[in-house]
Regions:
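Transmembrane alpha-helical segments of polytopic membrane transport and secretion proteins
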Residues: 1-13
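Short helix-capping/hinge motifs at transmembrane helix termini and TM-loop junctions
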Residues: 23, 27, 81-86, 114-116, ...
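Periplasmic/extracellular loop-to-transmembrane helix junction in inner-membrane transport proteins
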Residues: 24-68
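Hydrophobic alpha-helical elements at and bordering transmembrane segments
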Residues: 52, 56, 60, 90-97, ...
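Transmembrane-helix boundary motif in ABC transporter permease subunits
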Residues: 65-95
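Generic hydrophobic transmembrane alpha-helix motif, especially the helices
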Residues: 96-132, 139-140
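Transmembrane alpha-helices
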Residues: 123, 127, 160-191
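Short helix-to-coil transition segments within interhelical loops
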Residues: 141-144, 151-171
Length: 191
């Protein structure tokens, strides 16, 4: 614990020192402006013009909407893929193909299709989060212990009971993992 409490400030201090040294070099001064100049620009943007916080809110709104859409579409698609083989046979090859393409590769296509603004941001974030969350939740549903499903069937559980009382609770850790991964992907794609 003691080592960790010193490590973080030490690393930050070393990074600031390296930045300061690099900002005084002839070649590196353009890539690393002095710290005080950076903080001055931040102050000007945040306080004087007030654009900094507005831009942060706008960006996080885009990420939040894209994430929410990815979650709302990803959960049912994942459950349908895991539960019904015909659905899986149709959707899974497409998801496996599309998920290997970096989300940023969609930007030109989306901009051509819908124009510039918040909508293309949301669409690209939605695609990225949808794919990540769908695969994660799908794996969770597929990994539900078969013994639990058989036991519920023997006890007379209908499909709706099976879903609500067995599959959904057993898949909850995967859903939470999908939320964590999806939020990371949303913010990474936003940047």
């Amino acid at each position: 614990l003691y080592m960790n409490t010193l490590t973080v400030p030490g690393v930050l201090l070393a990074a600031l020192l390296a930045w300061t040294l690099l900002s005084h070099g002839e070649v590196t001064a353009r890539a690393f402006p002095p710290l005080m100049k950076v903080f001055g620009s931040y102050t000007k943007m945040a306080v004087d013009r007030g654009v900094f916080w507005g831009d942060i809110v706008s960006s996080l709104t885009s990420a939040g909407i894209g994430f929410a859409l990815g979650f709302l579409f990803g959960v049912p698609v994942a459950f349908l893929m895991a539960w019904y083989r015909p659905v899986r046979n149709i959707i899974e090859p497409w998801i496996q193909f599309i998920r290997n393409i970096p989300p940023l590769a969609y930007v030109p296509l989306v901009v051509i299709a819908v124009g510039v603004g918040r909508v293309p941001q949301v669409i690209v974030i939605w695609i990225a989060t949808f794919l990540t969350m769908t695969i994660t939740i799908y794996q969770g549903v597929r990994n539900v212990d078969e013994t639990l499903i058989k036991a519920a069937r023997v006890l007379g559980a209908k499909d709706s009971d099976l879903f609500i009382k067995v599959i959904f609770p057993a898949t909850t850790p995967f859903i939470l993992t999908a939320v964590r991964l999806g939020s990371s992907v949303a913010l990474t794609t936003l940047i």
